[in-house]
Amino acid sequence: MAQHQGGKGNFAEDPKRASEAGKKGGQASGGNFKNDPQRASEAGKKGGQRSHGGN
């Protein structure tokens, strides 16, 4: 595992900046079901179909 090497880009030193980066990442993600309920429904159906026939 890489050692921690501080610096200006270190989120541990600036929690507010880390929070903002997390929000931006979530907004940019294209797989957000909140904005597409139909897609979420289809994903749920697919998951249910695959979870029952494994044995």
From Swiss-Prot:
Transmembrane segments: none annotated. Residues 11-23, 36-45 have a biased composition (Basic and acidic residues). Coiled coil: none annotated. Induction: Highly expressed in biofilms. Disruption phenotype: Knockout of the gene increases production of pyocyanine and promotes P.aeruginosa pathogenicity in vivo. Deletion of the gene has no effect on phagocytosis, but it significantly reduces the production of cytokines in murine macrophage-like RAW264.7 cells and human macrophage-like cell line THP-1. In an acute pneumonia murine infection model, infection with the mutant inhibits cytokine secretion in the lungs but increases the infiltration of inflammatory cells compared to the wild-type strain. Signal peptide: none annotated. Residues 1-55 are annotated as: Disordered. Belongs to the con-10 family. May be involved in the regulation of the production of pyocyanine, one of the major virulence factors secreted by P.aeruginosa, and other virulence factors. This is Putative virulence-regulating protein PA2146. It comes from Pseudomonas aeruginosa (strain ATCC 15692 / DSM 22644 / CIP 104116 / JCM 14847 / LMG 12228 / 1C / PRS 101 / PAO1).
